[in-house]
């Protein structure tokens, strides 16, 4: 019983510290597009409804389009496969949005198989290698960025973060739920490597 009394507060403190660390985000200026530049922007996939990117995914896509329009990246690599019931895969829906926004087709790359963040990055790394691209800007939500960068680092990717400057997770409850989810998945990554 004494051990449990000591372990429980320590675990609560640990989880709280990890949650804070995730919430603060990576050290490399998340959300600041002013100083990022790379061969390619990797847009991590998110939900699609039918053929329409979710609001969260639209934020990521729009951020990548802005970086490409500013000349900070030459290519955009959209990641994400097709979920059951969707008309388009995540990367396909993102590509359609980018083309509609005027991004040249030759500047767009896709990978269509992944369903997790780690798969997004592993498959993106293969696409980059095939296209002769060496370094990347990884685009995701601010609270997702820490885990994404930990994964990219574990793969040996030359990458820097650029979190979306806005997020759809605005209310305290939405942020708390997403942060709890990210804290869980960060531990899952540390324990299982995915």
Whereabouts are the PLM-identified features?
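N-terminal type II signal-anchor transmembrane helix
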Residues: 1-32
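A structural signal for short, hydrophobic/glycine-enriched beta-strand patches
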Residues: 21-180
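A transmembrane-helix-recognition feature enriched in membrane-embedded lipid enzymes
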Residues: 172-194
């Amino acid at each position: 019983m004494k051990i449990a009394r000591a372990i429980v507060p320590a675990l609560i403190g640990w989880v709280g510290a990890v949650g804070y660390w995730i919430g603060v985000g990576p050290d490399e200026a998340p959300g600041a597009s002013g100083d990022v530049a790379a061969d390619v922007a990797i847009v991590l996939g998110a939900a699609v409804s039918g053929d329409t990117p979710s609001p969260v995914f639209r934020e990521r896509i729009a951020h990548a389009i802005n970086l490409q329009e500013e000349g900070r990246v030459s290519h955009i690599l959209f990641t994400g496969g097709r979920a059951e019931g969707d008309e388009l895969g995540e990367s396909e829906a993102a590509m359609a949005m980018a083309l509609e926004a005027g991004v040249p087709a030759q500047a767009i790359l896709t990978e269509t198989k992944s369903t997790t963040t780690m798969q997004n990055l592993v498959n993106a790394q293969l696409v980059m290698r095939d296209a002769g691209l060496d370094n990347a800007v990884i685009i995701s939500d601010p609270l997702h960025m820490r885990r994404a960068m930990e994964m990219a680092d574990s793969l040996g990717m030359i990458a820097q973060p650029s979190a979306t400057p806005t997020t759809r997770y605005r209310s305290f409850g939405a942020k708390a739920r997403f942060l709890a989810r990210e804290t869980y998945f960060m531990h899952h990554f540390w324990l299982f490597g995915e």
